[in-house]
């Protein structure tokens, strides 16, 4: 052992000495150094150029339109647009070979995954693996973070098994609908804006922060009550995120019950919606993620009645932060669902802001209109955040004016002086609740806990799931929000006249129309599209110039003697 160690040491020292000699020789050869530094040996540019690599990747990249057929335009926002699409591989997904083989690799996300979701999981896996390992788009596979944990565990003692209706109680009609849905899988494609008015080539700033956050979080998070990201496309400086499609959202459902006449949402349906929302929010918060934009338009409902939280564009992690929340995003949450601590100018906040938004959604499901429908004050030219006086006053009129006793450290908020200028209001939440048609005292109790002024005392998502509103009563909480309904909600409105995604790959800057200068050689040029030959116009102009020239010369001759006389 000693001899082998000595030999190894000798070999290592010999290698180091030879390496040093080689470096010395290179230093001698490279006598023409700049600033006393040996120039770095670089390969030929033909070897390390990026152009062939980009060309090869662009040629191998699968286009979003090659894989999906766009059906129509759904909605738009500050982020971009959302389109409904179906997979061009749907016929292949219905085959037994592809679907059955991939269904084994796809695991259900929660205990609520019924027969439909398991069957769709196989088809969903087929969609993701349709192009094999050579596909250049980003697949949002499963949960890659070991820290992420799902609450929906059958062994979780906190969730009473008696309050969950099993998915095996579906009737035959729903089973037939699920079988039909297997042949055609629909998706929602979210296209992010990356340019301004077609001048992306001049002012392209890269991928937005919102898109980066949503891509990063959606690839990690995996819960049955969050919209599932299928894959991501990067094409022509545009981001395309493909999600599972949800036929409804809460805004659409609320509008259906409030127009043309007011029809209350069934209490059993509201309870199912709230339980699933809180379950998804609980999963986010347990994994240190704030949503920061919860509202009815961002709460999706699938055809199977599963509630899914979507639009994580404003979401962010709140663990191990290097700066306050306010530094990154000064304005978060839509104004009607914004927590009072945000309205008072809090520079840092907690997951309690999401629970306030959930309380506002709960009240809107009961009353069929926003409970705090204020008017938003817009930012000025200096981009300073204005004080939302009208919105805060709407809250005070229903919940009453907070006091330092009910809300400690209230005086420390930046906008406390503005709050002190308002008149004193009394708590009127019970009156609003009964006028809106609410009858369940447990629902009113949960609403009080969610709309608590003090963010420290505001109930969190885990404890809200244990509230008596969900555990009390004979009717259990069902997984399908449409359970027991004798009517159907209309499908999403699809616009087929606004499919600019179909022009994919034609992102060119808007070039102003070229102004063609008139030339004497162009005999076919026209004036104003009237077909007037420019040669004729030129001849007429020359004749007019000649006539005017003769008259002007004659008049100049007549005027010249007079000028001489004046002199």
From Swiss-Prot:
Residues 102-122, 133-150 have a biased composition (Polar residues). The active site is at residue 293. This is Serine/threonine-protein kinase SSN3. Residues 90-101, 546-556 have a biased composition (Low complexity). Residues 88-179, 546-567 are annotated as: Disordered. Its main location: nucleus. ATP binds at residues 74-82, 190. PANTHER family: CELL DIVISION PROTEIN KINASE (PTHR24056), CYCLIN-DEPENDENT KINASE 8-RELATED (PTHR24056:SF495). It is an enzyme of class 2 (transferase). The keyword Lipid biosynthesis does not apply. Component of the SRB8-11 complex. The SRB8-11 complex is a regulatory module of the Mediator complex which is itself involved in regulation of basal and activated RNA polymerase II-dependent transcription. The SRB8-11 complex may be involved in the transcriptional repression of a subset of genes regulated by Mediator. It may inhibit the association of the Mediator complex with RNA polymerase II to form the holoenzyme complex. The SRB8-11 complex phosphorylates the C-terminal domain (CTD) of the largest subunit of RNA polymerase II. InterPro entries: CDK (IPR050108), Kinase-like_dom_sf (IPR011009), Prot_kinase_dom (IPR000719), Ser/Thr_kinase_AS (IPR008271). It comes from Candida glabrata (strain ATCC 2001 / BCRC 20586 / JCM 3761 / NBRC 0622 / NRRL Y-65 / CBS 138) (Yeast). GO terms for cellular component: CKM complex; mediator complex. Its EC number is 2.7.11.22, 2.7.11.23. It holds the Pfam family Pkinase.
């Amino acid at each position: 052992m000693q001899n082998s160690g000595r030999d190894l040491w000798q070999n290592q020292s010999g290698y180091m000495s030879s390496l040093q000699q080689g470096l010395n020789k290179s230093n001698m050869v490279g006598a023409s150094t700049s600033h006393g530094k040996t120039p770095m040996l670089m390969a030929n540019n033909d070897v390390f150029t990026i152009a062939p690599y980009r060309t090869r990747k662009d040629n191998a990249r699968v286009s979003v339109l090659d894989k999906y057929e766009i059906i129509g335009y759904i909605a738009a926002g500050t982020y971009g647009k959302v389109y409904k699409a179906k997979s061009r591989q749907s016929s292949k997904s219905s085959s037994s070979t592809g679907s059955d083989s991939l269904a084994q690799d796809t695991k259900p996300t929660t205990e609520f995954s019924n027969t439909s979701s398991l069957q769709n999981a196989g088809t969903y896996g087929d969609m993701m693996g349709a192009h094999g390992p050579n596909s250049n788009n980003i697949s949002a596979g499963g949960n890659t973070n070991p820290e992420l944990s799902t609450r929906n565990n059958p062994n979780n003692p906190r969730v009473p098994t008696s309050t969950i209706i099993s998915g095996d109680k579906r009737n035959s009609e729903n089973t037939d609908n699920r079988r039909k849905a297997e042949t055609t899988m629909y998706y929602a494609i979210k296209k992010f804006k990356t340019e301004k008015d077609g001048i992306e080539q001049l002012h392209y700033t890269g991928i937005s922060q919102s898109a980066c956050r949503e891509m990063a979080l959606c690839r990690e998070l995996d819960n049955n009550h969050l919209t599932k990201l299928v894959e991501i496309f990067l094409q022509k400086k545009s981001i395309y995120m493909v999600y599972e499609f949800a036929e409804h959202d809460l805004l659409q459902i609320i509008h259906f019950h409030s127009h043309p006449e007011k029809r209350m949402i069934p209490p059993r349906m509201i309870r199912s919606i709230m339980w699933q929302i809180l379950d998804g929010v609980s999963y986010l918060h347990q994994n240190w993620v704030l949503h920061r934009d919860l509202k009815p338009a961002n709460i999706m409902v699938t055809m199977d009645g599963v509630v899914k939280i979507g639009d994580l564009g404003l979401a962010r992690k709140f663990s191990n932060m290097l700066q306050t929340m306010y530094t990154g995003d000064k304005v978060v949450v839509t104004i009607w669902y914004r927590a009072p601590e945000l309205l008072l100018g809090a520079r840092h906040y907690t997951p309690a802001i999401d629970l306030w938004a959930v309380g506002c959604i709960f009240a809107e499901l009961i009353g069929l209109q926003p409970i705090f429908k204020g008017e938003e004050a817009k930012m000025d030219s200096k981009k300073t955040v204005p004080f939302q006086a009208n919105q805060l006053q709407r809250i005070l009129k229903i919940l009453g004016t907070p006091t330092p006793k009910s809300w400690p450290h209230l005086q420390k908020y930046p906008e406390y002086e503005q709050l002190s200028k308002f008149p004193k209001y009394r708590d009127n939440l019970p009156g609003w609740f009964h006028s809106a048609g609410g009858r369940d005292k447990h629902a009113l109790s949960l609403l009080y806990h969610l709309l608590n002024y003090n963010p420290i005392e505001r109930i969190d998502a885990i404890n809200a799931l244990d509230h008596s509103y969900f555990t009390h009563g004979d009717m259990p909480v069902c997984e399908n929000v449409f359970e027991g309904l004798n009517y159907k909600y209309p499908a999403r409105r699809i616009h087929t006249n606004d499919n600019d995604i179909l022009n994919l790959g034609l992102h060119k800057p808007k070039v102003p129309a070229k102004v063609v200068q008139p030339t004497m050689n162009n005999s076919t040029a026209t004036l104003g599209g009237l077909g007037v030959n420019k040669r004729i116009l030129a001849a007429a102009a020359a004749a007019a110039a000649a006539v005017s020239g003769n008259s002007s010369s004659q008049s100049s001759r007549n005027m010249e003697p007079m000028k001489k006389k004046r002199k």
